């Protein structure tokens, strides 16, 4: 006997949309006045490190096609949209004279988005430091970059504040720390733990200064930070495994979550760094500023869990310090996985994140700002001219069930934003894995809705979905 279907409904005024970033969608065009960021420069000197040598100049041509793309936001039912301003499009050298073409571009884009009744969230930094600041002073290792960022942020608040509903200081600030200073995976591809810690500290200080500047420009402006709050699960309840998971979350999540929301750093993390002589020089006034200027809300990105165990081997005393000295990945038998991306799919992790925020971070307001499924070779799922991405729809539904359960249990979540609106360029993988509700034909730049794009419109219109 078939059970009657029922609706999973979300709270009134719940936001539905997607997230993207300027570096991954805009592209570069003659006369646009944009300066090089780290990715532009790195691609110029080491194109072989990018899949198929697909660089940041390719992307999804949003700079030229923004009007069509905004119409597609409407067609896919967006009530919210998160994008980013490219620092080097506004200030080609990171500071100094603003680029009039860049300033005007974002103004017209934001005005058009708002004219469609879409809630606009704008991120100020998505891994895209102006290269001039890296070249002249080692980028985020130099405190002068912190002040350059503060001035750039204030300029944006003053220039676009009348159009932006929610500001974001940084997207996933732990990622450049890990991949740029621990793992030789992002520029400046160093392996230097002391530099990594200094970069993390300066990034947090910059975020707090931006919060201060935002509220100085207008106390009613709302500003937050987007963090990938990947929960860490121990292999077992053995004390060594439990400790490994706790330390993994210290580095991965709490290193930015605690100072951003609580205004303080976790004492255990500070002690670990002190024992290894990795603490940077800290001005007590800076710590007071971090304490006083916490965020108004959180953006949470969630794709996969971490599963860890205690390290099996003692670290080589002559090797550089890596966080894997404290924990190592654990491959759980029977896990569900996205074979295209190699990531575990674990929907309950989203519920666990919500509980953590509720119980340990004052149930601060938050939105799920990234969640999605990247798939390679989606063209094989095309029928009658449209990609039938039922796997993506199922992925979203499965996560929304857990999010709905969390909200029912008191989570203060105000919206769900997928990654991403249109197939976009990924930092080192180019267009290998497609995430969009809208298909991008790289050869023609034609945009075509996938099945998920039509479904997402229904999801938004119904404020939920039928089981």
What do the predicted segments below correspond to?
Residues 62-71, 93, 102:
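Internal amphipathic alpha-helical repeat/solenoid segments
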Residues 2-50, 74, 93-95, 103-467:
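Active-site region of glycoside hydrolase catalytic domains
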Residues 85-98:
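Glycine-rich, proline-tolerant flexible connector loops at the mouths of alpha/beta enzymes
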Residues 51-65, 141-143:
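Active-site mouth loops of central-metabolism enzymes
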Residues 65-86, 292-297, 360:
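Catalytic domains of carbohydrate-active enzymes, especially glycoside hydrolases
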